[in-house]
């Protein structure tokens, strides 16, 4: 498992390193992660990292100006001791690395949770782009599942295209929120549903990158609270969809078409999202978050609905409870 420091390491000169490099000093190797913390190199069964901090230190002592290569389940990397950088040999992305004295008391685990794996059915995942849109083939089980939900209240023959949204960051936020709610409630499962959200084309890319934000996307009256609205039925969500003209591409990377833009069609867009509705209560226009269950500021409901006996409309106030999973284009 990776480790992190509580503070950034102070910079040291070459002479400082030479003076401190004694046989009694235990050295550790770290890389600067996306979160801004220094993480220790350690073998990890989830990502199948082939190198440890100890391995890097041995290589460094052999040749302080050399390099060492290693792999994970997805990529190959090279550590350059002269540049003090780690390079992804596939994408070219670089990270800063650092050698520093290791003390057990100075480090703690990043988190209690295991690394979150990506869904096994995702395809050609590129972690260096914000998101990917992958068109589903209409003969697949995945396509038919989405089309069937749409078809409960609308004619599925109106569907022109269904695309899977692959956003690693949003997926991780969603999974961690789900784990947090389960831990807080002390339950093995949290109430989760696939729900529809209709919108206009101008918001589609922002949602795919940043998730839903009612302050930007609008709340259509906010009758049940100031949050993001979802519907059980596609027919209801279709009221908020606007016609748009776009090209009929089959694969996109963060909104950039990989095919020629020569076929233009008029269609509307609707999201099918995975939503943690949890414990819900009847909504109210004054709510800016779910109300309390017992009057405290701690024990809150997770979402609001139009009718607790037969909910058709759901309002979510925390975007981490949402993963925008599919984009449905229809006429």
Curated annotation (Swiss-Prot):
**Tissue expression notes:** Predominantly expressed in testis, preferentially in postmeiotic germ cells. Also detectable in other tissues, including liver, lung, spleen, thymus and brain.
Q: Which reaction does it catalyse?
A: L-aspartyl-[protein] + NAD(+) = 4-O-(ADP-D-ribosyl)-L-aspartyl-[protein] + nicotinamide; L-cysteinyl-[protein] + NAD(+) = S-(ADP-D-ribosyl)-L-cysteinyl-[protein] + nicotinamide + H(+); L-glutamyl-[protein] + NAD(+) = 5-O-(ADP-D-ribosyl)-L-glutamyl-[protein] + nicotinamide; L-lysyl-[protein] + NAD(+) = N(6)-(ADP-D-ribosyl)-L-lysyl-[protein] + nicotinamide + H(+)
List cellular component terms (GO).
cytosol; nuclear body; nuclear envelope; nuclear pore
ADP-ribosyl aspartic acid modifications at: 80
Molecular function GO labels? NAD+ poly-ADP-ribosyltransferase activity; NAD+-protein mono-ADP-ribosyltransferase activity; NAD+-protein-aspartate ADP-ribosyltransferase activity; NAD+-protein-cysteine ADP-ribosyltransferase activity; NAD+-protein-glutamate ADP-ribosyltransferase activity; NAD+-protein-lysine ADP-ribosyltransferase activity; nucleotidyltransferase activity
Cross-referenced InterPro entries, in alphabetical order? ARTD-AVP (IPR051712), Poly(ADP-ribose)pol_cat_dom (IPR012317), WWE_dom (IPR004170), WWE_dom_sf (IPR037197)
Q: Does the keyword Coiled coil apply?
A: no
Q: Superkingdom of the source?
A: Eukaryota
Gene ablation phenotype (knockout): Knockout mice are viable and are born in normal Mendelian ratios. Knockout males, but not females, exhibit a striking fertility defect, with the majority of males being sterile and a minority producing infrequent and small litters. Sperm from mutant mice exhibits mild to severe teratozoospermia, with structural defects in elongating spermatid nuclear envelope and chromatin detachment associated with abnormal nuclear shaping.
Using the chain's own numbering, where are the disulfide bonds?
Answer: none
Q: Which residues form the PARP catalytic domain?
A: 116-331
Modified positions (ADP-ribosylcysteine) in chain numbering: 49, 65
Family membership, please give it.
Answer: Belongs to the ARTD/PARP family.
Physiological role: Mono-ADP-ribosyltransferase that mediates mono-ADP-ribosylation of target proteins. Plays a role in nuclear envelope stability and nuclear remodeling during spermiogenesis. Inhibits the type I interferon activated signaling pathway. Mechanistically, mono-ADP-ribosylates beta-TrCP/BTRC to promote IFNAR1 ubiquitination and protect BTRC from ubiquitin-proteasome degradation.
Q: What is this protein called?
A: Protein mono-ADP-ribosyltransferase PARP11
């Amino acid at each position: 498992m990776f480790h992190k420091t509580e503070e950034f390491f102070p910079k040291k000169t070459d002479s400082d390193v030479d003076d401190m490099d004694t046989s009694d000093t235990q050295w550790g190797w770290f890389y600067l992660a996306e979160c801004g913390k220094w993480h220790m190199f350690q073998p990890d069964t989830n990502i199948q990292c082939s190198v440890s901090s100890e391995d890097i230190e041995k290589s460094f002592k052999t040749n302080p100006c050399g390099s060492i290569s290693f792999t994970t389940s997805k990529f190959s990397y090279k550590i350059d001791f002269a540049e003090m950088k780690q390079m992804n040999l596939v994408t070219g992305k670089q990270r800063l690395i650092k050698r520093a004295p290791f003390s057990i008391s100075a480090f703690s685990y990043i988190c209690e949770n295991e690394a979150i794996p990506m869904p096994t059915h995702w395809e050609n995942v590129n972690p260096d782009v914000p998101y990917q849109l992958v068109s589903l083939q209409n003969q697949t089980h995945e396509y038919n599942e989405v089309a069937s939900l749409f078809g409960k209240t609308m004619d599925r023959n109106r569907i022109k295209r269904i695309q899977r949204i692959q956003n690693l960051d949003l997926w991780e936020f969603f999974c961690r929120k789900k784990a947090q709610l389960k831990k807080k409630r002390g339950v093995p499962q949290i109430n989760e549903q696939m729900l529809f959200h209709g919108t206009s084309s101008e918001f589609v890319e922002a949602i795919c990158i940043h998730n839903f934000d009612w302050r930007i996307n609008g709340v259509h009256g906010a009758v049940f609270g100031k949050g993001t609205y979802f519907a059980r039925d596609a027919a209801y969500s279709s009221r908020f969809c606007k016609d748009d003209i776009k090209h009929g591409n089959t694969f996109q990377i963060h909104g950039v078409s990989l095919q020629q833009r020569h076929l233009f069609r008029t269609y509307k867009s609707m999201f099918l999202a995975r939503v943690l509705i949890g414990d819900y209560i009847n909504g109210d226009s004054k709510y800016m978050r779910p109300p309390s269950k017992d009057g405290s500021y701690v024990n809150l409901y997770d979402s609001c609905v139009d009718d607790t006996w037969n909910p058709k409309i759901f309002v979510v106030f925390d975007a981490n409870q949402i993963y925008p999973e599919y984009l449905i284009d229809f006429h």
